[in-house]
């Protein structure tokens, strides 16, 4: 295993010995990303009209989370050399010398295979196949290729982070319907303005690490224009669940106000281009974009899971 790691990744020499504990291995799984995956997959389960055994649902959510963590672990294994250079990632377990790269690779591969097999046995093989595709797409297509090859890295790579609602729906129904597809598209279109806002502030870090993020390749002004363009697409897309009948009054209000706020903040980023004001505007959009996505999916969860759904047509009835 060590020879494979050594031949593939320059991170091989970062740590001669491991002194990592359980917390360090858990950190390899990117717990915050795992939490978001659990949440969005749960919403994907909830927006369907079908039901699933609670035990199967719980096991499935756990396996989806483990699969997401496994892909994060493989990402950290591959990117350990880059993480060692960037200020916000240099304390991660591998560059910090707490866990050896070969250990991280073995850990990630074991969790990947185990989570896919368990999800297939607990739920169905469509859900397991989608999880396997998600892991492979993030760990191989994004981490090993796109991230260091193109400024469109997070645009294309964002598909991996957008798939959990589709996996959740597949767990319950054995298929993927319009609901899962729309939730996928919302997260997919949300990803570029979210990450590019951060990249505007951290462009120096990315440049030092040799990562071709949009601000470093196309320039800050072009990035700002693209942020506005994606947000203009995201705002109406966020209302699609209402138009398709699985988002109600609560969701519609959250999507409308949240979309307008996203637009306002993206325009601030566009107009504030220099000094502390520029960084403040970018971080403001970055922070609010997280809240926006959380509120959107929370509204769907409240309506469908807690019985609070009221159709928008009631306003005109």
Curated annotation (Swiss-Prot):
Disulfide bonds: none
Listed GO MF terms: protoheme IX farnesyltransferase activity
Name listed for the protein in its UniProt record: Protoheme IX farnesyltransferase
Keyword check for Metal-binding: no
EC number in record: 2.5.1.141
PANTHER family reported for this sequence: 4-HYDROXYBENZOATE SOLANESYLTRANSFERASE (PTHR43448:SF7), PROTOHEME IX FARNESYLTRANSFERASE, MITOCHONDRIAL (PTHR43448)
Function, in words: Converts heme B (protoheme IX) to heme O by substitution of the vinyl group on carbon 2 of heme B porphyrin ring with a hydroxyethyl farnesyl side group.
Organism: Methylobacterium sp. (strain 4-46)
Pfam families for this protein: UbiA
Protein topology in the membrane: Multi-pass membrane protein
Gene Ontology terms: cellular component: plasma membrane
Positions of transmembrane segments: 25-45, 54-74, 126-146, 154-174, 181-201, 227-244, 249-271, 281-301
Note: Carbon 2 of the heme B porphyrin ring is defined according to the Fischer nomenclature.
Reactions listed under catalytic activity: heme b + (2E,6E)-farnesyl diphosphate + H2O = Fe(II)-heme o + diphosphate
Pathway(s) of this molecule: Porphyrin-containing compound metabolism; heme O biosynthesis; heme O from protoheme: step 1/1
Subcellular location: Cell inner membrane
